[in-house]
Amino acid sequence: MAFLKTLNPLLRRSPTPIPNPRSLLSLDAFLAASSPTAASHATAPAPFAAAAHHHVPIRSGGPLFLSSPPWMLSQSATPLTAAAAALRARLRRARALAGGGAQAVADAVGWEPRRISRDESEVAEAVTGGRERFLNLPNLVSIGRMASGPVIGWMIVNEWYLPAFGTLALSGASDWLDGFLARKMGINSVFGSYLDPLADKVLIGCVAIAMVEKDLLHPGLVGLVVVRDLLLVGGAVYKRASSLGWKWNSWSDFVNLDAIHREKVKPLFISKVNTVFQLMLVAAALLQPEFGTEETQNYITVLSWLVASTTIASTVGYGIKYRQIRPRR
């Protein structure tokens, strides 16, 4: 207590006044302490001495106008409104990415998904699903029947008549099997409607040409069948090109019948009858070298005339159908 009484008079007689602790936190004190000439001009009056009684606390990291005098503010300082808006935008993005879902993310970034029309969605679905439609089980059966044609022809040329007959019987049964599977599986493939008759034509053509080589069928009859099949295949290609307006980006677009301009091929009834007679004729002619007689040869002759007549009738029928559906210019 005596020490404090002794110290108090000494402090009052001191020539250097002790600054007020609150003034040390004022704006003028901060500027004086941070100025390089603060030591030499400590007693000089401040230019804005009139405002020295306003003591503003220093807030580190706050806005610029609280930490600098007006003449030192930069024009590039970020306004509070812009900073607050940017902060709110960042918070929205953070909440969206943290678990707000796809719609919240879209709202945060200002993205609006484009509405896809029904036609565009159907085309996209057909294009992306083209491989699945092409590689279904009924189409694979048709492809197998088509591939068996050259194999059976090779067997006939090498006089393997019985193996050729057995393979032909299986291939003929597959003509019924692919349609049965398509109905049971609910598959309605436009490509399959083209592939099924094409497989029949390749099979019959390869077998018939090989049988002409071995004098098992008349060349005129085989020529009639082959020409008719070529005309039908050419007509199918022409029909597909016409449906596309003779414009397509690539051959994949042309052969992808399940994508755009879907139009199935519907064979005539007379054409189905012709296919049955052709298979019967080829099977009977294959058995003729091993088990044939003069009587069976007569049956083969009758079947040959039936095949010729139904071939001509189906060709005429397709010609009439083409003229009916052909657009008039």
Curated annotation (Swiss-Prot):
InterPro entries: CDP-alcohol_PTase-I, CDP-OH_P_trans, CDP-OH_PTrfase_TM_dom, CDP_ALCOHOL_P_TRANSF_CS. It catalyses: a CDP-1,2-diacyl-sn-glycerol + sn-glycerol 3-phosphate = a 1,2-diacyl-sn-glycero-3-phospho-(1'-sn-glycero-3'-phosphate) + CMP + H(+). It is found in: Plastid, Chloroplast membrane. Its cofactor is Mn(2+). It is an enzyme of class 2 (transferase). Catalyzes the committed step to the synthesis of the acidic phospholipids. Transfers specifically a phosphatidyl group from CDP-diacylglycerol to glycerol-3-phosphate to form phosphatidylglycerophosphate. This is CDP-diacylglycerol--glycerol-3-phosphate 3-phosphatidyltransferase 1, chloroplastic. It comes from Oryza sativa subsp. japonica (Rice).
